[in-house]
Amino acid sequence: HKSVKELLGENIKNSDFTEKTWYYKQEHGQEFEIEVADFKVSYKDNELKVDFGTSGYGRDNRKYKVNIENVEIVFDSSSIELFANDGSFTLSTRFYPNNHNVKISANNYVAQKLGKIEIREEN
């Protein structure tokens, strides 16, 4: 998403890693599954699923029927921002994982570290 372009860092080459703040991008409507501890977001057969596990503190899992052509996801230590189909479908949620062990099951994707947002006071 254009709001994170300036924050993009180096590529993450492994499908298993422990970054807290990172970016995921995939084109061509392919299926994917991303796990952060016991939180999971996945897409298969035109269904986007969000499974919170214990990271959601009792919140219900979510399912959306949507045909995803492209997706960008921003993860930080306790939130996810998902932009599908050039932003025509969006999803934001909080989650509270007990660790940041990430596992990606997907093909033809890009994962990148994200830099920190600096908030400065203007004089």
Where is each model-derived feature located?
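Beta-rich accessory regions
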Residues: 1-123
